[in-house]
Amino acid sequence: MARDYYGILGVDRNATDSEIKKAYRKLARKYHPDVNPSEEAAEKFREASVAHEVLTDPDKRRIVDMGGDPMEQGGGAGHPGGFGSGGLGDIFDAFFGGGAGSRGPRSRVQPGSDTLWRTSITLEEAFTGVKKDLTLDTAVLCSKCHGSGSASNAKPKTCGTCHGSGEIQEVQRSFLGNVMTSRPCHTCNGTGEVIPDPCDECAGDGRVRARRDIVADIPAGIQSGMRIRMAGQGEVGAGGGPAGDLYVEVMVRPHAVFTRDGDDLHASIRVPMIDAALGSELEVESLTGEEITVVIPAGTQPNQVITLEGEGMPRLRAEGRGDLMAHVDLFVPTEIDDRTRELLEQIRDYRRDNSSVHREGEEHGGLFDKLKSKFRNR
């Protein structure tokens, strides 16, 4: 089972790198063996160090966010109870903001970040599926240097400040004594290399900000809050690194008539009192504008739900559709003509004089059938 690295540090899943480092420093000061010699503290210190290592590594953090555990996939500490690769440096980073030992330069070419884009569609578009045009402000490959960062396509040279290590080492005094710490080189930004003739378009980064048009194919049956992954459509990485992914989050706007519940649709239908009593068939308009026949059973009650199977939303990437739930809104007229009033009064008198409408209707079929016929013909 994957460990809860966010819980170990006491941060939420949306925590920034600075928040993660701040939480780690707080725990490191509390549980460091030189401050707290207990075995329990040593275990908590080890857990915090591993969690910090994982969550400050973009690739490892992505594995965690997908439900995995990078420390169980050959990407973490190699020895039980150890601090993992770079763990000792993380300990000193908690106290002094730098590492105790050299970790080596980071690659100048970095993978790009994922991008989240939110868009809204109508319920009709969610029913049929739709292609949505998106315009993104994102990092794209520099068209002038094609990602190399160099104006003349020259190869990077070793940084003269850090001599290729990517780090600047310093000696700091602490309660532990003199400690050698290291920080990313400010000249090469920790890569150990510099571009001798930076591209004037991207300043040597290999990418620029630009607006880019993308078409998102939104499938039929999608629901609010769902995300569509478009691989390689995110931001291009530094140094012309591979682009991240684009996630399009869809919000389905409310509809004036239909309410959605999963793959089912709900709608109110107005049923005249006589049709509810005698039974009838009504034509209603579906979400797509087609006419649907709704059978109203005799004796239908107010707020009764009539299910129309297979008339709901399409199932996402599957066959079939949900159901349409028709909620009966019983309509009682506020104004009636004299003939209608006369017939209704006859029904009322008939019901008063007979204890059972069904039984007496059979015995006095002439009057009941006559009234029934007249109401059907109105």
Swiss-Prot record:
Pfam families: DnaJ, DnaJ_C, DnaJ_CXXCXGXG. CXXCXGXG motif repeats lie at residues 142-149, 159-166, 185-192, 199-206. It comes from the Bacteria. InterPro entries: DnaJ, DnaJ_C, DnaJ_domain, HSP40/DnaJ_pept-bd, HSP_DnaJ_Cys-rich_dom, HSP_DnaJ_Cys-rich_dom_sf, J_dom_sf. Residues 4-68 form the J domain. The keyword Chaperone applies. GO terms for cellular component: cytoplasm. SUPFAM superfamilies: Chaperone J-domain, DnaJ/Hsp40 cysteine-rich domain, HSP40/DnaJ peptide-binding domain. Signal peptide: none annotated. Its main location: cytoplasm. One of its GO terms (biological process) is chaperone cofactor-dependent protein refolding. Binds 2 Zn(2+) ions per monomer. A zinc finger (CR-type) spans 129-211. GO terms for molecular function: ATP binding; heat shock protein binding; unfolded protein binding; zinc ion binding. Zn(2+) 1 binds at residues 142, 145, 199, 202. Zn(2+) 2 binds at residues 159, 162, 185, 188. Belongs to the DnaJ family. This is Chaperone protein DnaJ 1.
